[in-house]
Regions:
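Membrane-interface helix-boundary motifs at transmembrane edges
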Residues: 56-68, 114-120
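Short, membrane-exposed interhelical loops at transmembrane-helix boundaries
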Residues: 151-171
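Alpha-helical transmembrane segments and their immediate interhelical/interface regions
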Residues: 46-57, 82-110
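Hydrophobic alpha-helical membrane-insertion segments
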Residues: 124-142
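Membrane-helix interface motif
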Residues: 25-26, 140-155
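Alpha-helical transmembrane segments
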Residues: 7-21, 74-76
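Hydrophobic alpha-helical transmembrane segments
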Residues: 164-187
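Membrane-helix interface and helix-disruption motif detector
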Residues: 24-40, 63-64, 82-92
């Protein structure tokens, strides 16, 4: 299933990415030259891949047995990475809501929870992803308001014939943040619900044969 492949990539890339970033930041902080920074970055990636290889090789690692605190850290890590990579544009962070909903449904399905517990868990993960999205939107708004060129950049980007005022920026930030917050909640909710039902139907079909 493509969903399982995506989860394996998401969880499998954590260690290599952390190692890469640690080596890169270390080189930058000591004021190394470009060639040393590049060499350090590649070395960090290779080191991370080697570590990941031995983790997987042991065969004791299961993404569905990770602690909730670890899952939260991984989610926040990717949210920050995407926020930085896409230069503070939060729309790309919406993808993590669906991934989280899919993962949480798969994690719970084997426990066969009752309807009350299932509803509570679905709400928990949906609220969590929405809150993280809210924080991402706040960060995006903060950087937008602290950058004196934001208004001019928006005017040029969208070829506007009028000046962008602070009031407009505030309105767009509030409206956009609210839309992203609600969208993330429902994306997570829908992904969870659809995944859980599909897994149940698949299980029933398998058992009936």
């Amino acid at each position: 299933m493509i969903g399982n492949f995506i989860l394996k990539v998401v969880f499998g890339a954590v260690v290599p990415l952390l190692s890469l970033m640690a080596f890169w930041w270390s080189a930058v902080l000591i004021g190394a030259g470009d060639s040393i920074i590049l060499l350090s970055t590649v070395s960090g990636l290779i080191a991370g891949l080697v570590i990941e290889y031995f983790i997987v090789r042991k065969g004791k690692f299961s993404i569905y047995k990770l602690r909730t605190s670890t899952l939260i850290l991984i989610y926040v890590f990717y949210s920050i990475c995407f926020f930085g990579f896409f230069m503070g544009v939060p729309v790309f962070n919406l993808v993590f809501g669906s991934v989280a909903g899919y993962y949480w449904a798969r994690k719970l399905v084997n426990n066969n929870p009752d309807k009350v517990v299932l509803r509570e868990e679905k709400t928990k993960v949906s609220v969590f992803t929405a809150l993280i999205m809210g924080l991402i939107c706040l960060l995006s708004a903060y950087f937008a308001f602290t950058d004196v060129h934001t208004a001019a950049n928006l005017k040029g980007m969208f070829n506007l014939s009028f000046e962008v005022s602070n009031g407009m920026l505030i309105g767009v930030s509030i409206a956009g943040g609210a839309i992203f917050f609600v969208s993330q909640y429902f994306l997570t909710d829908v992904a969870f619900e659809k995944t859980y039902r599909n897994l149940l139907n698949l299980s029933k079909t398998t058992n009936s044969k």
